[in-house]
Amino acid sequence: MAIDENKQKALAAALGQIEKQFGKGSIMRLGEDRSMDVETISTGSLSLDIALGAGGLPMGRIVEIYGPESSGKTTLTLQVIAAAQREGKTCAFIDAEHALDPIYAKKLGVDIDNLLCSQPDTGEQALEICDALTRSGAVDVIIVDSVAALTPKAEIEGEIGDSHMGLAARMMSQAMRKLAGNLKNANTLLIFINQIRMKIGVMFGNPETTTGGNALKFYASVRLDIRRIGAVKEGDEVVGSETRVKVVKNKIAAPFKQAEFQILYGEGINSRGELVDLGVKHKMIEKAGAWYSYNGDKIGQGKANACNFLKENPAVAAELDKRLRDLLLHSNGELVAATNEGFDDEAETSEEF
């Protein structure tokens, strides 16, 4: 629809004044000189990258990962760090729980010599460190473990048993307002790990909630609910966890999708097992009885041997990964674009699954 000529001149003058006062790019037309595709970092799980719709977690956004104890929250974030470092990105880990195990992180592929780590004394200090790292523009991924451990200074300095109603929620709300814009400008991914609490007196619906108030729920572009749904066994020995992740909120693609994968103790996400399962499902790997074949060549009898073949032949694993991503993430040759900003918390559910 054509705009009246006088209005057009007035708009051009207003835009010129805004850009002069606040800098170039402070206002622009949505489709002008910018990619609608969101840059992402892999989660280390192919099925979760596919469930997220854009190939991973979005840069320049806030992400929340929550779930019960020992469900794989920290493992998942360490896999994100490992994936980011392989791309040459700088990462920081804000260890508010004072529980990061560098030996375990190294086993998951994290370059601990180049990982920035902070163990802050108070919640305010942790969030100020996040803000300073973001404003530097030099850090690409920041992990905060966890929101529940971000204790306000007043609570630390007070007596045990003192009431500090809403202090943490106010602190988080103020931090979100300050961080959201800076993260976008710096193109920094900020991941908050969160814990689950129970609401008292809930008769109907899900009694579970996350700590730190509601601000994080609104500011997060992606919220992931991670659960342990079973054990991975070799004979009678438990060697890992069957894990399910639900995309509870997603502003970059369609939400409510699920991914299931294995987390092996001491190794992290069983990415090769995912490649075999998805390869068979999408007919890239042929399965005849117990034998698995790829491109006409047998790669192993039984899933474990097929996984070992991919471990010993990383070039084949990389090729299969690329083929699966091209098939499942691309539509008409273009990556899924950020066209789903309309999804918000009104549509959000956090029911247990």
Curated annotation (Swiss-Prot):
SUPFAM superfamilies linked: P-loop containing nucleoside triphosphate hydrolases, RecA protein, C-terminal domain
Keywords: ATP-binding, Cytoplasm, DNA damage, DNA recombination, DNA repair, DNA-binding, Nucleotide-binding, SOS response
GO molecular function list: ATP binding; ATP hydrolysis activity; ATP-dependent DNA damage sensor activity; damaged DNA binding; single-stranded DNA binding
PROSITE patterns: RECA_1, RECA_2, RECA_3
Pfam families: RecA, RecA_C
Subcellular location: Cytoplasm
Gene3D superfamilies linked to this entry: P-loop containing nucleotide triphosphate hydrolases
Annotated GO biological process: DNA recombination; DNA repair; SOS response
Highest taxon above the source species: Bacteria
GO cellular component: cytosol
InterPro entries: AAA+_ATPase (IPR003593), DNA_recomb/repair_RecA (IPR013765), DNA_recomb/repair_RecA_CS (IPR020584), P-loop_NTPase (IPR027417), RecA-like_C (IPR049261), RecA-like_N (IPR049428), RecA_ATP-bd (IPR020588), RecA_C_sf (IPR023400)
Residues where ATP binds: 67-74
Its biological purpose: Can catalyze the hydrolysis of ATP in the presence of single-stranded DNA, the ATP-dependent uptake of single-stranded DNA by duplex DNA, and the ATP-dependent hybridization of homologous single-stranded DNAs. It interacts with LexA causing its activation and leading to its autocatalytic cleavage.
Similarity section: Belongs to the RecA family.
HAMAP family: RecA
This protein's name: Protein RecA
Species of the source: Serratia proteamaculans (strain 568)
